[in-house]
Amino acid sequence: MGATRARIAIDAMGGDHAPDEIVAGALRAQAELDADVLLVGDPDRLEASIKSHSDSVPVEIIPSEGLIEMNEEPISALRRKRKASINVAMDLVKKKKADAVVSAGHSGAAMAAALLRLGRIPGIDRPAIGGVFPTIIAGKPVLVLDVGANVDCRPAFLDQFATMGTIYSEYVLGTEAPKVGLLNIGEESCKGNEVSVQTYQLLEQNPHVDFIGNAEGRDVLSGQFDVIVCDGFTGNILLKFAEAVGEVALQILREELPRGIHGKVGTGILKPNLRRIKQRMDHAEHGGGLLLGVAGVCIISHGSSQAPSIFNAIRLAKEAADNQVSQRIQSCYQQTVTAASNGE
């Protein structure tokens, strides 16, 4: 995108802590990142929230009406509430008035809005959400997809996830020649159900990925793999479990640190280390999951996201937009689409 500043549309009404925490994260992004944020939502509430921050910076507000509630069926709600914040935000990307969308609201609605308004990239059967996990190697995260968009997957879907994940890992996470694994119950190519066996065969033949074999559950955080593919049912459970393990580990550390005067001294010495541990294990550091396979950049954040997570989600959106992830995926599949249309 050259010297052009990325424009990030924020669904400011979506999320458990909207709009205040969303606004706080957006204001920080406007101040610290080489990007412009567009706050989409109720102008009165957004202006009041902006004024409540002493470090507020000028941001653009895009009016919307209402939001998609968590108990609403996504498709019908999106069609009924055409001026809802997530619809308006997606339309900004569709009309080239923004380069990406960030939403901590109804994840199903965000995915549906992206599909309805932005559309799938030609050649992609199903979009997938990519979740970034820490590994035992500092600075070497692993991308897992899908983590929630598709409960059931065909082998062809998983094969496409591997290609999209490779592009994400290389251009956003900065991984050189990402190594891809298939989440399975054993290392051998014959292990798993029929979908796993067929997917293994497809991945071996995929010229766009460096497939190194099956990844067992114990391998996910080992640093051996850069991209791991699985269906969204398994991936979402893995994501939530990893989040819980991180929280439990931090709580155990707090409980087991020595108490009393000696404990305070020891804790003071260890404080920088504890801060780094928390940073590596905190899912808020990654901001959210990138919806891969749609014709635009869409970051789906955790519903409980607070300002730091929103800031990181905006940072991720900017990196994905600047590095043209969606366009690179489209270019990768253009040859396949052209061949299919020519009957090859």
Swiss-Prot record:
Single annotated GO MF: phosphate:acyl-[acyl carrier protein] acyltransferase activity
GO cellular component: cytoplasm
Quaternary structure and partners: Homodimer. Probably interacts with PlsY.
Gene Ontology biological-process annotations: fatty acid biosynthetic process; phospholipid biosynthetic process
Protein origin, superkingdom: Bacteria
HAMAP family xref list: PlsX
Family statement drawn from the similarity comment of this UniProt entry: Belongs to the PlsX family.
Principal location listed in the UniProt entry: cytoplasm
Enzyme class, spelled out: transferase
InterPro entries linked to this entry: FA_synthesis, Phospholipid_synth_PlsX-like
Function: Catalyzes the reversible formation of acyl-phosphate (acyl-PO(4)) from acyl-[acyl-carrier-protein] (acyl-ACP). This enzyme utilizes acyl-ACP as fatty acyl donor, but not acyl-CoA.
Keyword annotations: Cytoplasm, Lipid biosynthesis, Lipid metabolism, Phospholipid biosynthesis, Phospholipid metabolism, Transferase
Protein name: Phosphate acyltransferase
